[in-house]
Amino acid sequence: MKTIIALSYIFCQVFAQNLPGNDNSTATLCLGHHAVPNGTLVKTITNDQIEVTNATELVQSSSTGRICDNPHRILDGKNCTLIDALLGDPHCDGFQNEKWDLFVERSKAFSNCYPYDVPDYASLRSLVASSGTLEFFNEGFNWTGVTQNGGSYACKRGPDNSFFSRLNWLYKSESTYPVLNVTMPNNDNFDKLYIWGVHHPSTDKEQTNLYVQASGRVTVSTKRSQQTIIPNVGPRPWVRGLSSRISIYWTIVKPGDVLLINSNGNLIAPRGYFKIRTGKSSIMRSDAPIGTCSSECITPNGSIPNDKPFQNVNKITYGACPKYVKQNTLKLATGMRNVPEKQTRGIFGAIAGFIENGWEGMIDGWYGFRHQNSEGTGQAADLKSTQAAIDQINGKLNRVIEKTNEKFHQIEKEFSEVEGRIQDLEKYVEDTKIDLWSYNAELLVALENQHTIDLTDSEMNKLFEKTRRQLRENAEDMGNGCFKIYHKCDNACIGSIRNGTYDHDVYRDEALNNRFQIKGVELKSGYKDWILWISFAISCFLLCVVLLGFIMWACQKGNIRCNICI
């Protein structure tokens, strides 16, 4: 029985070797491109989902969880807000004259001095934050006739009653509080920021005890502006044992201008000025820890890499950051259209070209050749067309990043309740900008993906046409990305086709002769496969009949015994 099976196998192998297409006088050369078993889906202008061999994610969706201290100078506010550090709250004395690129305010920050409010809090905070320094210069104001350096038990500096270190609380001297009229010129060539305030006592008695007059007034003027504040006497909610308040105001004095302060009571006077600097410093609210690392882009969630053009970590950023978009993912095609290779190529192992499917396992190039000739089969990459495609795709990601990365920061906006309508408008504008950028990002990526796929398809077609021009009438286009070569073409011949040195004149006569001989006996392609399968089926049927007849004859002669058990 084993002998019969072995003979049958040998018969089929011989039969297969004699099939058309296995003639040693011809060869098959196929062109193809790289493919992978599982590609990546990307979006193009014409297709929402198209599979490519490789793609790069463009949206940064996670942070490091910490704020990197390099290359930006980070100042951790710890328990202090920027305004408390500016005013000189006793527990913020460590921030005097500090500098920063980014001031990080913590949610745990608190005030620990006299209760105050800042009518234009957001503007003052933004102004000081962008200046990037708390550098302070004392000036010799002349406050004749009043007592200086007032303090409060609500503002302890050590065991002693104290006050904001950058402000001077003035109150009556003996039983008088004269009208104060003090000037301070700006003879320097930079802007000066003066912080001052108005005290609002909780009762009329407190008002007269401190300032004699039943109603005070504070006027601060420059050549460009004037502010007059009338104190509002009356009780307020208790904070740190006090129901009185201080309102904080600020004035910028330009070079050559003069600061004029006029008051008959309730003045919280400046001790000097802050030097206003122009720069790109900023402030951010975050509870992320500050770590030793390097990152150009910072968000409240922590630092993020800026090697991608988009991010959806946070709208608030500082530094050179990817553009914020709503999408969680945007994939940029960095490979060609993926057509996974078919695992079965028929019973005789035929090869196929790029029109049918891609080729898996081409690790040394994107485009290449497969051949079948008298010496067997082989595969080689075409490095020139591969490099042409890669050169055009390389740098695509960098170009997208250059178009989208912000070289500035986006700070959070703060508004008082009075500015609610402005806040709503600002939110609408920001949301609209994000919607537009999200749409633009998706469109940009889709356009780039379309270009990449068209480009890689074009390189494949260029290689195919180049090969066709070399072979001319020596080969026939089989319609699947392959050529049937009508002359004997060994591996050296195949190599000359690949490297562009093939001389079709050398093989022209042989190819024409073989073409006419093969065409003379070759059936039309519409019937060839049917005849092949029918002849194979008949051969197998006859083989089975012969085998069955032999078994029956052997049983009759007693050479084979068959036992049937029930």
Curated annotation (Swiss-Prot):
Protein's UniProt keywords contain rRNA-binding: no
Record keywords: Clathrin- and caveolin-independent endocytosis of virus by host, Clathrin-mediated endocytosis of virus by host, Disulfide bond, Fusion of virus membrane with host endosomal membrane, Fusion of virus membrane with host membrane, Glycoprotein, Hemagglutinin, Host cell membrane, Host membrane, Host-virus interaction, Lipoprotein, Membrane, Palmitate, Signal, Transmembrane, Transmembrane helix, Viral attachment to host cell, Viral envelope protein, Viral penetration into host cytoplasm, Virion, Virus endocytosis by host, Virus entry into host cell
Bilayer topology annotation: Single-pass type I membrane protein
GO cellular component: host cell plasma membrane; membrane; viral envelope; virion membrane
Ranges in coiled-coil conformation: none
S-palmitoyl cysteine lipid attachment residues: C555, C562, C565
Signal sequence annotation: 1-16
Location in the cell: Virion membrane; Host apical cell membrane
Site-annotated residues for Cleavage: R345, G346
Gene Ontology terms, MF aspect: host cell surface receptor binding
Transmembrane segments: 531-551
Ranges of the Cytoplasmic topological domain: 552-566
Bridged cysteine pairs (disulfide): C30-C482, C68-C293, C80-C92, C113-C155, C297-C321, C489-C493
Membrane-side (Extracellular) residue stretches: 17-530
Record PTM text: Palmitoylated.
Glycosylation (residues): N24, N38, N54, N79, N142, N181, N301, N499
BP term (GO), one: fusion of virus membrane with host endosome membrane
Pfam family, one: Hemagglutinin
Primary subcellular site in the record, as a coarse category: virion
Family: Belongs to the influenza viruses hemagglutinin family.
Additional notes on this entry: Major glycoprotein, comprises over 80% of the envelope proteins present in virus particle. The extent of infection into host organism is determined by HA. Influenza viruses bud from the apical surface of polarized epithelial cells (e.g. bronchial epithelial cells) into lumen of lungs and are therefore usually pneumotropic. The reason is that HA is cleaved by tryptase clara which is restricted to lungs. However, HAs of H5 and H7 pantropic avian viruses subtypes can be cleaved by furin and subtilisin-type enzymes, allowing the virus to grow in other organs than lungs.
Subunit structure: Homotrimer of disulfide-linked HA1-HA2.
Free-text function comment from the UniProt entry: Binds to sialic acid-containing receptors on the cell surface, bringing about the attachment of the virus particle to the cell. This attachment induces virion internalization either through clathrin-dependent endocytosis or through clathrin- and caveolin-independent pathway. Plays a major role in the determination of host range restriction and virulence. Class I viral fusion protein. Responsible for penetration of the virus into the cell cytoplasm by mediating the fusion of the membrane of the endocytosed virus particle with the endosomal membrane.
Protein name (record): Hemagglutinin
Record organism: Influenza A virus (strain A/Memphis/2/1978 H3N2)
Highest classification ranks of the organism: Viruses, Riboviria, Orthornavirae, Negarnaviricota, Polyploviricotina
